[in-house]
Amino acid sequence: MANTQYPESYYAASANAVPPRPVLQDDVETDVCVIGAGYTGLSSALFLLENGFRVTVLEAAKVGFGASGRNGGQIVNSYSRDIDVIERTVGPKQAQLLGEMAFEGGRIIRERVARYNIQCDLKDGGVFAALSAKQMGHLESQKRLWERFGHTQLELMDQRRIREVVGCDQYVGGMLDMSGGHIHPLNLALGEAAAVESLGGTIYEQSPAVRIERGANPVVHTPQGKVRARFIIVAGNAYLGNLVPELAAKSMPCGTQVITTEPLGDELAKALLPQDYCVEDCNYLLDYYRPTADKRLIFGGGVVYGARDPANIEAIIRPKMLKAFPQLKDVKIDYAWTGNFLLTLSRLPQVGRLGDNIYYSQGCSGHGVTYTHLAGKVLAEALRGQAERFDAFADLPHYPFPGGQLLRTPFAALGAWYYGLRDKYGL
């Protein structure tokens, strides 16, 4: 049987109070059945409830069990593909609409935190750190591109300036985005779940969707119950399994690994990140890190294709941390865990309909914290009959992985090896 308890992570250890939630053991009827109580599902549910829909959420494990409660906690704007790449793929009109939405997810998070008084250690400020002149040139282009779409809270930093905000000698410069930032991701999910329930929504935990009965009046079956709904939103992402085979064929779960140090104390914590900003480098296979409210360092990186859990996470990530911060060589690691995100071949999200009444969003490809909150709003708009923004995402190409589900992992790993060489040699 699959493990449905939270992993032994820093987030689970420092989570706010988690109320018990029921297992679905009846037949219920609702307007919208949401499958998955991660960010996509919770964001969808909140927007729908705020607009008068009855909503039932089915969660196979616990609220925020998947990527939403395990990620690096960074509020990173835009998508995993730059908007200019999207423009070359879909043309200027569709790219303009997608570009205008690229910075909305972070605003939604802040609005939710304020409106529902969610305690999740929200901090402003995110740094993109360049390891080479080539990467710095890319950041300069990215700043110009983002400013085209009205995103102006950006500062290019030379080597001297980035050293003021990151206590690491390996960066040649960077870009500071003050509308970026970081949060305790599990506490954000728990707060959003409480908001769903405060508006009359129902969340069932330990209630996996095992079958969707499609048709004019779709039914979602769980081991002990079922939900009849006008609409279904599929929001399982990397933890969906094969519930919807046509979605599984066009995406691949991938694992990323995270460690958390023991408390560092004020002096050492301030030496690493004086302004409490979060940081990610500009490599294809990137490293990311941030401070916590209790003066620890969370550091993540690495990709394991096919969602396998590595045997020794600390052995993979600690050397990356020490390369950035050798002064942490004697610091103890208190927590190490892995979590899955869903990769698409295009590295763009996949959004669409199955028939007239089953909607889905998946495949954030590493930019899930902000995109999922936007996705919830866009899905809710579509169910209300306002589908222009939904269609802008739905019209993006959904490419299958070469070789199907059997060969997608080795093909992706080969691609990652190639990009890892590019990172190593600055190509």
Regions found by a protein language model. Name each.
Residues G137, S141-L145, Q170-R230:
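Helical element adjacent to the flavin cofactor pocket in flavoenzyme catalytic cores
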Residues S78-R160:
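Dinucleotide-binding Rossmann-like beta1-alpha1 core, especially the glycine-rich loop
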Residues R21, I118-F128, R161-A195, L199, ...:
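Helix-loop-beta segment of a Rossmann-like dinucleotide-binding subdomain
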Residues E50-R70:
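Glycine-rich FAD pyrophosphate-binding loop
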Residues T30-V57:
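N-terminal Rossmann-like FAD-binding beta1-loop-alpha1 element of flavoenzymes
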Residues R107, R115-K123, A209-R211, N217, ...:
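Active-site substrate-recognition segment that forms the wall
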